[in-house]
């Protein structure tokens, strides 16, 4: 699976960062305040109230859990929370915190009301998670000093702080950890209008000339994800400078994205490979995810975390108790005739009894 994993990481429409350079690029375009943050109106409105209330009381903000598909702005929101609160932000990730001492070192160096951001928090080890519980509730941690019979537990007081946890797999969080977050927010996919605003803002920061229709052409192929929209903008900007006069119009954007093999709904080769496997190898489904993973040479987690969310959200794929099923939209997208109602396995399209 090494080559396949590499291909997944290099997808132009991958929702995860593909290189350190892209991470630096993202930081340069990242909004710095809530008022600059586009989309997620409900979450943004809630955070505005909670942050203002905490500041008026001179308290730390309640612990915040942000979850949703990758690339929607969880890290950006963590930075904005710290900046709006006027405090420092310390950033780490679940897999990095291998030992209890790793977390203890971070916690004991936090100043009053600081923000600790843990990405991929669902990947914390049980040992580290146990240390985190009293820190979240009582701002205290227990550490062991010494070894063997002489070892003893010492309780250390911590400064009040805010934990911001981010995850793409909220269902993998343990109940005790989830219950310790006072603020829980799900980030949703963006619509094309919101993404067009993000593309326009990013183009301005990059000093690129873009027409509204060009921004919308990029936005509608960005799979509802700001990270993808900004990545496509960079590639379209390159195309516009070399193959056009530098202006990003709808025609220029369309030509650039066709060159990149990104179709009108944001599908790339891997998306089409998955959907075509369901259509042609499994007669439209249902097919179990393990069989599907074997058929296209992908990891199960990649299908569930990277490929499926957008396809399901856009109505091209359905999860059923019996497996994955192609929808009528999928047949139409590939120019195929859908099964008739007497033989169809498509749920919910003709037969209300299907599940």
Curated annotation (Swiss-Prot):
Chief localisation class: cytoplasm
UniProt-listed Pfam families: AAA_lid_4, RuvB_C, RuvB_N
Regions annotated as coiled coil: none
GO-annotated cellular components: cytoplasm; Holliday junction resolvase complex
Record GO biological process: DNA recombination; DNA repair
Segments for region (Head domain (RuvB-H)): 264-355
GO molecular function, one term: ATP binding
Reactions mediated catalytically: ATP + H2O = ADP + phosphate + H(+)
Source organism superkingdom: Bacteria
Residues the record lists as binding DNA: 300, 319, 324
Residue segments, region Small ATPAse domain (RuvB-S): 191-261
Keyword line: ATP-binding, Cytoplasm, DNA damage, DNA recombination, DNA repair, DNA-binding, Hydrolase, Nucleotide-binding
Record-listed Mg(2+) binding positions: 75
Localisation: Cytoplasm
Entries under InterPro entries matching the protein: AAA+_ATPase, AAA_lid_4, DNA_helicase_Holl-junc_RuvB, P-loop_NTPase, RuvB-like_N, RuvB_C, WH-like_DNA-bd_sf, WH_DNA-bd_sf
Protein EC: 3.6.4.-
Domain notes: Has 3 domains, the large (RuvB-L) and small ATPase (RuvB-S) domains and the C-terminal head (RuvB-H) domain. The head domain binds DNA, while the ATPase domains jointly bind ATP, ADP or are empty depending on the state of the subunit in the translocation cycle. During a single DNA translocation step the structure of each domain remains the same, but their relative positions change.
Family classification: Belongs to the RuvB family.
Record's function text: The RuvA-RuvB-RuvC complex processes Holliday junction (HJ) DNA during genetic recombination and DNA repair, while the RuvA-RuvB complex plays an important role in the rescue of blocked DNA replication forks via replication fork reversal (RFR). RuvA specifically binds to HJ cruciform DNA, conferring on it an open structure. The RuvB hexamer acts as an ATP-dependent pump, pulling dsDNA into and through the RuvAB complex. RuvB forms 2 homohexamers on either side of HJ DNA bound by 1 or 2 RuvA tetramers; 4 subunits per hexamer contact DNA at a time.
Complex formation: Homohexamer. Forms an RuvA(8)-RuvB(12)-Holliday junction (HJ) complex. HJ DNA is sandwiched between 2 RuvA tetramers; dsDNA enters through RuvA and exits via RuvB. An RuvB hexamer assembles on each DNA strand where it exits the tetramer. Each RuvB hexamer is contacted by two RuvA subunits (via domain III) on 2 adjacent RuvB subunits; this complex drives branch migration. In the full resolvosome a probable DNA-RuvA(4)-RuvB(12)-RuvC(2) complex forms which resolves the HJ.
Protein name as catalogued: Holliday junction branch migration complex subunit RuvB
Upper classification of the organism: Bacteria, Pseudomonadati, Pseudomonadota, Betaproteobacteria, Burkholderiales
Gene: ruvB
């Amino acid at each position: 699976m090494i080559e396949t994993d590499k291909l997944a990481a290099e997808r132009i429409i991958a929702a995860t960062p593909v290189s350190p350079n892209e991470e630096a690029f993202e930081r340069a375009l990242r909004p710095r305040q809530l008022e600059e943050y586009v989309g997620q109106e409900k979450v943004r409105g809630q955070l505005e109230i909670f942050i203002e209330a905490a500041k008026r009381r001179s308290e730390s903000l309640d612990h915040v859990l942000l979850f949703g598909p990758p690339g929607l702005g969880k890290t950006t929101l963590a930075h904005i929370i710290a900046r709006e609160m006027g405090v420092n932000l310390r950033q780490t990730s679940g897999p990095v915190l291998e030992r209890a001492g790793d977390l203890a070192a971070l916690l004991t160096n936090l100043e009053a009301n600081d923000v600790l951001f843990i990405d991929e928090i669902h990947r914390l080890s049980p040992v580290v998670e146990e240390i985190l519980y009293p820190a979240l509730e009582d701002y205290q941690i227990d550490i062991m000093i010494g070894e063997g019979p002489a070892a003893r537990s010492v309780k250390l007081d911590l400064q009040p702080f805010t934990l911001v946890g981010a995850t793409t797999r909220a269902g993998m969080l343990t109940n005790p950890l989830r219950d310790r977050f006072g603020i829980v927010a799900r980030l949703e996919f963006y619509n094309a209008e919101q993404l067009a605003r993000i593309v326009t803002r990013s183009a301005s920061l990059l000093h690129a000339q873009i027409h509204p229709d060009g921004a919308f052409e990029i936005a509608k192929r960005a799979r509802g994800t700001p990270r993808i929209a900004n990545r496509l903008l960079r590639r379209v900007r390159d195309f516009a400078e070399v193959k056009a006069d530098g202006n990003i119009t709808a025609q220029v954007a369309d030509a650039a994205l066709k060159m990149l093999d990104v179709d009108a709904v944001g599908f790339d080769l891997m998306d089409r490979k998955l959907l075509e496997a369901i259509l042609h190898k499994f007669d439209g489904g249902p097919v179990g995810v393990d069989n599907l993973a074997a058929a296209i040479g992908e990891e199960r987690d990649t299908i569930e975390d990277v490929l499926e969310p957008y396809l399901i959200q856009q109505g091209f794929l359905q999860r059923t108790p019996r497996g994955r099923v192609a929808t009528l939209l999928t047949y139409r997208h590939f120019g195929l005739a859908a099964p008739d109602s007497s033989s169809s396995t498509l749920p919910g399209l003709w037969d209300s009894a299907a599940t």
